[in-house]
Amino acid sequence: MKEENEYIVKRRKKRRRKRITIFLFLLICILVTLCLKLPYFNIKYINVEGNKIIKSDNIIENSKLKKGNNIFYLNLNKYKDNIMQDPYIKNVSIRQKLPNTIDIIVKERQAVFYINSGENYFIIDKNGVLLEIRKNISGMNLIKLDGVTLKNGKIGTEIPCDSRRLELINQITSVSIKDNNLKITDVDMSHILSLKVYFKNMCVVIGTPDDIYNKLNEAVNVIISQKLIDKKGYVDVSFKGNPVYSLQQ
């Protein structure tokens, strides 16, 4: 009799657990359906962060994200790929913030150099990535690259150039210049073992590319300390020892 009662109790507990499981499953189904159908979860706000070059409206337009779509129906990878089509975008992430907000966080590439070929100006970033081809670069404040021949290239990829020159392009941009009036205007890579960097009319003779960071910093210190910013001449840091400079009259 005792065993029979225990069996009945176990069966009741089992049925109760089954009913609870079914109830929870149905409740979850109802909640999911409501989330997918209720206007409460439709996209109302799309925010863009991290952009200084590309307008927020352009990024949103390129993403193909639409207000009014359900926030749970999004294929985030598709929208990321859409945004990454712009060569000025280096990286992007998209966050869903319940109930109705999308945050787009971008990291941009910055135009630093240009290569002139005929009537075209090839705009590249510090890593040698081709950002665009223009007919006019007025107001862009870019550094001219000499000694790199470029007739074509695929936008959004590295320019067809040897690895040593690509590395130098990156290293040159890492030099810290504290004087806002002193800016690199031209880099001559015509001869990889006889590099030259120009600050307006002041030529810095780098020589071989080894230790280019320290060489450039030494030259910058000389130009600033000797007040050579608006002068014409050269600073030679191609050898070991103190830099030498000479001015043209």
Swiss-Prot record:
The UniProt record lists the POTRA domain at 41-109
Transmembrane residues, as ranges? 20-40
Q: Name one GO biological process term.
A: FtsZ-dependent cytokinesis
> Which stretches face the Cytoplasmic side?
1-19
Q: Where in the cell is it found?
A: Cell membrane
Q: Which GO terms describe its cellular component?
A: cell division site; plasma membrane
Instruction: List UniProt keywords, sorted A-Z.
Output: Cell cycle, Cell division, Cell membrane, Membrane, Transmembrane, Transmembrane helix
Q: Which family does it belong to?
A: Belongs to the FtsQ/DivIB family. DivIB subfamily.
UniProt xrefs under HAMAP family:
DivIB (MF_00912)
> What this chain does, per the record?
Cell division protein that may be involved in stabilizing or promoting the assembly of the division complex.
Give the protein's recorded name: Cell division protein DivIB
User: Which organism is the protein's source?
Assistant: Clostridium acetobutylicum (strain ATCC 824 / DSM 792 / JCM 1419 / IAM 19013 / LMG 5710 / NBRC 13948 / NRRL B-527 / VKM B-1787 / 2291 / W)
